[in-house]
Regions:
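Small/polar glycine-rich anion-binding or flexible loop at a beta-alpha turn
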Residues: 26-29, 44, 58-60
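A short, conserved structural fragment
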Residues: 46-56
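Short, amphipathic alpha-helical interaction segments positioned at domain boundaries
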Residues: 64-82
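Short amphipathic alpha-helical interaction segments
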Residues: 30-47
Length: 82
């Protein structure tokens, strides 16, 4: 998964459920690059079924994957080297 997509997954996993992911506030809070990068990453992640959007709320539908991302982001453990 490309870095921009990983960053968005980490951000949404941290939030649990995220609204307005392309807003300046969300982008700043999670140190994302730009709204266009977030939009492109979200589109691709939804194509891969790694991200779901319902009523303008984005979330990771697989709870185990979401928990894995939360733990990975919060502990700085690298399970699979890049």
């Amino acid at each position: 998964i490309p870095e921009r997509q990983k960053e968005l997954l980490y951000a949404i996993a941290s939030a649990g459920k995220a609204e307005k992911i392309m807003s300046a506030g969300f982008i700043r809070k999670y140190s994302l690059v730009s709204s266009s990068a977030v939009q492109a990453a979200a589109r691709k992640l939804m194509e891969l079924d790694l991200l779901t959007e319902e009523d303008n709320i984005y979330f990771i539908p697989d709870i185990l994957f979401r928990m894995y991302l939360q733990r990975l982001k919060n502990t700085n453990i690298i399970f699979i080297p890049s």
